């Protein structure tokens, strides 16, 4: 499989915008959606970013790499040395590294990456049928 880097770059930027929007409009979104939306979008951005970087990898491998990255970041939130907490206190550091470990984040990452992988596999299936 060869992914189109332009498409994955556009999706990555679009997902970043949606993620920032989900934070800006969190006061009007339902609590259930707020629990998962931002982190699911963050994981989706990681998936599309990995798709951009590793354009020849199979969907499942891209998903595993993306999910592993998300899990490493989440579990790193259990570590609270002064230097890393200073990074987390910045806007960008907080967005990338997060603040505290939550099991709901693990669920959200899994949902976001599974959704992206499912969409990618669906699109690939449609493309294959058109070529037949």
Swiss-Prot record:
Source taxon at top rank: Bacteria
InterPro entries recorded: DUF2809
Membrane topology per record: Multi-pass membrane protein
Pfam family of the protein (one): DUF2809
One GO cellular component term noted in the UniProt record for this chain: plasma membrane
Keyword Cell membrane in annotation: yes
TM stretches of this protein: 6-26, 34-54, 59-79, 106-126
Localization in the cell: Cell membrane
Keywords: Cell membrane, Membrane, Transmembrane, Transmembrane helix
Protein name: Uncharacterized membrane protein YjgA
Native species: Bacillus subtilis (strain 168)
Upper classification of the organism: Bacteria, Bacillati, Bacillota, Bacilli, Bacillales
Encoding gene per record: yjgA
